Amino acid sequence: MMAAPRRPFFRRRKTCPFSGAGAPKIDYKDIKLLLRFVSERGKIVPSRITAVSAKKQRELARAIKRARFLSLLPYVLK
């Protein structure tokens, strides 16, 4: 008896956390929000991992860089 063919597992694509009603606004002063998108070493996490849209990823990167420049966020975390 043959086993039934397996269907491939599709991981559901997460939606952008910054789109939709009630979504937080990207602001360079909101350090708690920005830290969610920075790795433990201080690097900006890519959008394929965080599921942020391309437009919002650019906004996020700009906000993180602004916060770093103003010493609100460190460039490197230890």
From Swiss-Prot:
Example of a GO MF term: structural constituent of ribosome
GO biological process, one term: translation
Pfam families hit by this protein: Ribosomal_S18
GO cellular component, one term: cytosolic small ribosomal subunit
Keywords linked to the UniProt accession: Ribonucleoprotein, Ribosomal protein, RNA-binding, rRNA-binding
InterPro entries linked to this entry: Ribosomal_bS18, Ribosomal_bS18_CS, Ribosomal_bS18_sf
Family: Belongs to the bacterial ribosomal protein bS18 family.
Main function: Binds as a heterodimer with protein bS6 to the central domain of the 16S rRNA, where it helps stabilize the platform of the 30S subunit.
Subunit structure: Part of the 30S ribosomal subunit. Forms a tight heterodimer with protein bS6.
Name of protein: Small ribosomal subunit protein bS18
Species of provenance: Rhodospirillum rubrum (strain ATCC 11170 / ATH 1.1.1 / DSM 467 / LMG 4362 / NCIMB 8255 / S1)
Gene, per the UniProt record: rpsR
